[in-house]
């Protein structure tokens, strides 16, 4: 008789959020293995907030909802003073007391070992042998400020099924004006190179799941062109240079109402409901970045609205900020073999969306021989 293990995968960019994560999800789905991938641990002011971030991780681990998870592995890269390696990534893995057959890979001795207790690792993680962590090199984007972007990898055997779980944080769009200059944008090209690097760095044929903040954006130039077909365009440049400061699109009728205003960190569209109606399905045709990886990566159907940039105000959890064009930045991607795995057990792959860009997936892994 086959044994099934319920696995919950969660990715959350916690740059401005340190509250309870998915209590109702844990209670409702009762997973046996939980993988939480966090990005921007400590937030933008990480030098001041890292202590609060650490408290958040320990509070979550000791919460009432986690009492039946008797083993865990927690990795937090909090060494912001080590600029060459700091990624601000955090990965937490919780194992339920009913799950017996689980092992983790030691990348130093190149062997799997049973997980028997709660393990916490906080620091640069350079000497921790059960995790691989890397900050993307400066030459990945020489024309832009070097930021705390990178990836963190762990490897597991769950009921004789081996798999990699990779926490990823790719580069963002620094300027809306630059993003809509070309299709694809220069930022998209940078993300493409970095993600290909992550995939090619794996030294195994095991199935893998990549989940984190990919910062994938819509094809902004194509989207803006389609949104503004019946609008007049006004370009405003800085007095001291020929540099574009803002682009304003006004409706040709309706008293020339401003339809769309774009600045470096402003994307204010009049009809914001289009990003939420029918989970933003009409915008999926502009979501093109993942298509470049279809040779090695698959993704289940997106059944939630764009995950970014939700308001950071707790009273406005479903409202988008006017800072960026909404997009599906937070994703859970998988290798072809990983998708075959979840489809082979005829599972119902649950796609959930909650506030503040958290993306959750529930899957089942069945027991069979071999990795």
Regions found by a protein language model. Give the residues of each.
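Hydrophobic, aliphatic-enriched repeat segments that assemble into extended interaction scaffolds
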Residues: 32-40, 87-89, 93-96, 204-225
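Amphipathic alpha-helical scaffolding segments
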Residues: 25-28, 32-33, 51-61, 108-120, ...
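Charged/polar interaction segments and conserved charged motifs
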Residues: 107, 111-119, 142-144, 148-157
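N-terminal, active-site-proximal structural segment of metallo-dependent hydrolase catalytic domains
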Residues: 1-92, 101-102, 121-142, 152, ...
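Short helix-loop capping/hinge motifs at secondary-structure junctions, enriched
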Residues: 99-104, 339-340
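Core residues of folded domains in eukaryotic genome-function proteins
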Residues: 3-10, 30-37, 88-90, 103, ...
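Active-site beta-strand termini and strand-to-loop segments that position acidic
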Residues: 94-97, 154-159, 335-336
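Catalytic lobes of large eukaryotic enzymes
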Residues: 65-76, 129-141, 145, 158, ...
């Amino acid at each position: 008789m086959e044994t099934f293990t319920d696995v919950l995968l969660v990715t959350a960019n916690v740059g401005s959020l340190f509250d309870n994560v998915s209590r109702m999800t844990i209670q409702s789905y009762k997973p046996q293995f939980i993988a939480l991938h966090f990005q921007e641990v400590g937030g933008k002011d990480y030098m001041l907030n890292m202590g609060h971030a650490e408290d958040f991780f320990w509070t979550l681990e000791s919460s009432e909802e986690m009492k039946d998870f008797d083993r865990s592995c927690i990795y937090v890269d909090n060494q912001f003073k080590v600029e060459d390696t700091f990624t601000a990534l955090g990965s937490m893995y919780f194992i339920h007391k009913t799950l017996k057959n689980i092992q983790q890979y030691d990348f130093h001795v190149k062997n799997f070992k049973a997980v028997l207790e709660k393990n916490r690792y906080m620091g640069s993680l350079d000497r921790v042998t059960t995790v691989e962590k890397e900050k993307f090199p400066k030459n990945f984007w020489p024309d832009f400020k070097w930021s705390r972007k990178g990836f963190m990898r762990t490897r597991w055997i769950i009921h004789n099924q081996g798999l990699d779980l990779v926490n990823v944080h790719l580069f963002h769009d620094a300027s809306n004006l630059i993003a809509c200059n070309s299709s694809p944008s220069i930022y998209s090209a940078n993300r493409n190179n970095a993600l290909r690097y992550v995939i090619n760095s794996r030294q195994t044929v095991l199935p893998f799941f990549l989940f984190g903040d990919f910062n994938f954006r819509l094809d902004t130039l194509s989207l803006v062109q389609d949104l503004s077909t019946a609008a007049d365009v006004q370009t405003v440049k800085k007095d001291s240079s020929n540099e574009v400061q803002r682009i304003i699109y006004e409706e040709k009728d309706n008293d020339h109402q401003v339809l769309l205003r774009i600045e470096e960190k402003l994307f204010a569209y009049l009809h914001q409901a289009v990003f939420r109606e029918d989970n933003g399905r009409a915008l999926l045709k502009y979501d093109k970045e993942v298509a470049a990886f279809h040779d090695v990566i698959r993704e289940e159907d997106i059944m939630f609205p764009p995950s970014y940039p939700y308001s950071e105000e707790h009273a406005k959890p479903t409202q988008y900020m006017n800072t960026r064009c909404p997009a599906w930045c937070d994703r859970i991607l998988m290798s072809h073999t990983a998708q075959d795995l979840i489809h082979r057990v005829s599972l119902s792959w649950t796609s959930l969306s909650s506030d503040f860009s958290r993306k959750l997936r529930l899957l089942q892994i069945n027991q069979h021989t071999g990795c």
